[in-house]
Each structure stands twice: as C-alpha cells, then as structure tokens.
C-alpha cells in the first residue's frame, strides 16, 4: 500500500499503457452487454472505469491506498455511476453475491494470501458472475497462476497472455 501511496501522482504515467493492454485483453472475452453491478477490486486510479462504467448499473472501485483513490476520484468525476470505497480486498465491506462482473487487475500478486483474496471476490460475486483476474508473469508461472485459480474454485473460461506482461483470466465460479 505504501508504494502505491508514494507513486499515486505518477501511476498513470508509468503504467496506464500496460494496464490498458490487460483490460483490453480481458474485454475481448467479456460480454459488452448491460453489466449490472461491476466491482473493480484494487481499482488504482480507475483506468477500468472508461471500459465498463457507461454500461454498468453502478461500478464500485475498491482500493487500500487512499492516495491512489484520490486519483480515481478525479477520473470518476466523468462517470456519475461510479462509487469508490477505501477498503482491503481481503475484507470488503460489501454484501454477498451482488456483483455481475468483478475485475481484479494487477491485484493478486500484491496480496498476502491470493487464495483468500479470490475467495473474498467470490463472496461478493453473484452465482453467474464473470470474474476477471490478472497475474503478473514475474510473480507467477502459467501453471502456478492456473493452480491458484483452481485452488480458489474458479473455472477458467478464457486465458490470454500473448504480448502481455501478465496472464489475463476470465473466470466463473465453479458449481458445487
């Protein structure tokens, strides 16, 4: 968190292009229809908002860094249906099973227990939710990333990594 607080004012200059590539890769496998409620866990400066906010009933961005949320707040001024929450991804102050789409872009390698984080994401996602998770290649092997998603009981619908610095997985909850 401290790293993101320190770099919040320059985050977009450093990472916007890389983040956009990840988001665009994910959006190729995500239906562009009406979204319902969208959650962006680890929303950072809110780069995802321009891809989903216009088609969503409401988009909620959560981040643990207050300073980076201030940058997201500026971006959210262009999107009246965006709400921001300062919270930990492992303990989100949200109801169960409400989000139709959950995005965790450049998040899980920054959490102490990625499976716990993914389980919390599943808790707030509805039964038919689309869950997008990215994992940096410098943090995970492909096999390790897939194993992590399986350990969290996520079904991988699409997986992309060509030309990216990360793996982009579009998932659903596994039926029990």
Regions found by a protein language model. Give the residues of each.
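A short glycine-rich, Lys/Arg-flanked "PGG" loop and its adjoining helix->strand segment in the class I
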Residues: 115-127
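Conserved beta-strand signature within the Rossmann-like core of class I S-adenosyl-L-methionine
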Residues: 128-135
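Class I SAM-dependent methyltransferase SAM/SAH-binding core
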Residues: 39, 45-91
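Conserved class I S-adenosyl-L-methionine
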Residues: 1-33, 47, 139, 165
């Amino acid at each position: 968190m401290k790293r993101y607080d320190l770099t919040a004012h320059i985050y977009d200059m450093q990472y916007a292009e890389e983040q956009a590539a990840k988001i665009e890769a994910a959006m190729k496998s995500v239906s562009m229809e009406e979204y319902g409620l969208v959650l962006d866990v680890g929303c950072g400066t809110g780069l995802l908002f321009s891809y989903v906010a216009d088609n969503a009933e409401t988009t909620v961005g959560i981040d643990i860094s207050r300073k980076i949320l201030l940058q997201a707040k500026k971006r959210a001024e262009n999107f009246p249906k965006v709400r921001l929450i300062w919270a930990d991804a492992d303990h989100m102050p949200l109801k169960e099973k409400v989000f139709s789409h959950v995005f965790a872009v450049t998040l899980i390698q920054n959490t102490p227990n990625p499976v716990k984080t993914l389980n919390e994401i599943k808790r707030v996602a509805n039964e038919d939710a689309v869950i997008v998770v990215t994992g940096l290649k410098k943090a995970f092997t492909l096999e390790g990333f897939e194993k992590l998603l399986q350990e969290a009981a996520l079904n991988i619908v699409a997986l992309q990594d060509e030309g990216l610095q990360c793996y982009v997985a579009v998932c659903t909850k596994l039926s029990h």
